[in-house]
Curated annotation (Swiss-Prot):
SUPFAM superfamilies: Class II aaRS and biotin synthetases, tRNA-binding arm. GO terms for cellular component: cytoplasm. Catalyzes the attachment of serine to tRNA(Ser). Is also able to aminoacylate tRNA(Sec) with serine, to form the misacylated tRNA L-seryl-tRNA(Sec), which will be further converted into selenocysteinyl-tRNA(Sec). It comes from Methanosarcina mazei (strain ATCC BAA-159 / DSM 3647 / Goe1 / Go1 / JCM 11833 / OCM 88) (Methanosarcina frisia). This is Serine--tRNA ligase.
Amino acid sequence: MLELKFVRNNPDIVGRALISRNMGTELIDSLLEYDAAWRECLIEGDDLKHKRNVVTREIAQLKKENKDAASRINEMQGINSRIKELDDKIRDYKSKINEIMLSIPNIPSETTPVGKDENDNPVVRVVGEPREFTFTPKPHWEIGESLDILDFERAAKISGQGFAVYKGMGAKLERALINFMLDVHTRQGYLEVFPPVLINEKAMTGTGQLPKFKDDMYGCTDGFYLAPTAEVPVTNLFMDEYMENLPVFLTAYTACFRREAGKHGQDTRGIIRNHQFNKVELVKFVMPETSYEELEKLTLDAEEILKLLKLPYRVVSLCTGDLGFSAAKTYDLEVWVPTQEKYREISSCSNFDNFQARRANIRYRTPEGPQFVHTLNGSGLAVGRTVVAILENYQREDGSVEIPEVLRPYMGGAEEIRKVCH
């Protein structure tokens, strides 16, 4: 969340930021209107409360002198009535202001490229060369079904479309990747945590999922939401706290839940975009002056997984029109998917400046007074999409799949996945 005072004093800066995000400036116009009315009511209310104190003393003095205080009492009643009216308006305006403030996205960093959509995202670097196949590669869902390691039919039977059952070596591959990713990241200096995935509304608001993305979330009847990403519970671990000993680096595995499956035509099959998926997350809490340096390091930490798996990928810098709601700057890691002949997102690494920390009230102490920390996070990585990349990039002509060398110790020494005849 932005600071109200900043928006009030810099409407042009905020307005330009919204325009760069393909938004209008109506939110700012409404905010300034409510803010002016709110402050006007505050001033009038303070003046009337001061006047009420004066009249109260006058009434007391008149009664003490046995004089008629009726006119002053009538005046007091009018003052009290107006104060109540103003208090109601103040609450109403404040509610409207808070609602708008929660709906205003972060201001993009000066280093975030300006653009309209993903077509304007510049490529930062390309790592590895896409494999040249001597046969026609199969899509991951065909590989998974032919090897009997992915079952979409039975998943649909119990949960509907947009789910998958991992079986045998498929389940082992998923589990191996989670453990491998966590091991790599803990060696990089991240502390592993295992948080709840049922999240309350306050925490969801703290990281920016609510109110804007409510329709994309799975809500429960008792006020909880299923975590759409481990970013939410991990960042909110320090909600309403003063943090000591910055920086703090955390990594976590969780299942994630989103309603987005089926929104993208080419992803209606397979496991690229499901309602439920696993992800390993990286989260950093840092001092403001180091946050952009830490973003570069976090991105490299996420990239390390792809390098160790020897998967070809590229890094792109998201432009203003493609930037997430809470982010000031984002790098996307995109892995090569052979059957689509293009790179697909497998991680987003973002610096949120103090946007999330202000919403979640995460601060640290300085000699000048309390300050909001800067938060960063990134996927390290989306596990299902990593399975997609392995199945497609490591497939063989005979239908088997080679297991990346770094994963073999996590899979009992197995070097390949072949269909098991029961």
